[in-house]
Amino acid sequence: MINQGLFIRVNNFQLLKASLAYKKASNILTFPPIRTSTKHGGGSSKNTGDSAGRRLGIKRSENQFVRAGEILIRQRGTKFHPGDNTGLGKDHTIYSLVSGYVKFFQMDVSLRKRRKYVGVVFDKETTLPRPKDEPTIRRVNKYITSANSAQVS
């Protein structure tokens, strides 16, 4: 007589083998084709964003007439410093405080350091920097006057 346990084991093995073959065949038939890694592995890149330029630089040239509030220089940091009749914005933009003519000049700050300045003067022939002993020129009621000149009321 055949051992019943052996028969069951052999029968179970054959069933298992048949079911695996069926699953293998059914997987091939039912699943769609898979693309290779050349398509799926696109990856990521970190340095693709190229932003537009910020339009920095000198906006008005030497001896050019400007009105009050006009931007003279847009810059990052203080490559140029504000001189006479100019102001410095919070983003280091230099702008005109009065109407006049643009002048660029350099001054020694220390023995080894020289700074570039931009200023606005009322008369085209005026040069900057002005001597330290010379009084500053201011515009009062559209007339150019000296700072130490006496005004009669």
Curated annotation (Swiss-Prot):
Molecular functions (GO terms): structural constituent of ribosome
Region annotation Disordered: where it falls in the sequence: 34-57
One of the record's GO cellular component terms: mitochondrial large ribosomal subunit
Cell compartments where the protein resides: Mitochondrion
Keywords: Mitochondrion, Ribonucleoprotein, Ribosomal protein, Transit peptide
Any Pfam family: Ribosomal_L27
Family annotation (Gene3D superfamilies): 2.40.50.100
Location of the transit peptide in the chain: 1-37
Ranges in a coiled coil: none
BP-aspect Gene Ontology terms: mitochondrial translation
Description of how the protein assembles with itself and partners: Component of the mitochondrial large ribosomal subunit (mt-LSU). Mature yeast 74S mitochondrial ribosomes consist of a small (37S) and a large (54S) subunit. The 37S small subunit contains a 15S ribosomal RNA (15S mt-rRNA) and at least 32 different proteins. The 54S large subunit contains a 21S rRNA (21S mt-rRNA) and at least 45 different proteins.
Entry-linked PANTHER family: LARGE RIBOSOMAL SUBUNIT PROTEIN BL27M (PTHR15893:SF0), RIBOSOMAL PROTEIN L27 (PTHR15893)
Function: Component of the mitochondrial ribosome (mitoribosome), a dedicated translation machinery responsible for the synthesis of mitochondrial genome-encoded proteins, including at least some of the essential transmembrane subunits of the mitochondrial respiratory chain. The mitoribosomes are attached to the mitochondrial inner membrane and translation products are cotranslationally integrated into the membrane.
Family: Belongs to the bacterial ribosomal protein bL27 family.
Stated name of the protein: Large ribosomal subunit protein bL27m
Organism: Schizosaccharomyces pombe (strain 972 / ATCC 24843) (Fission yeast)
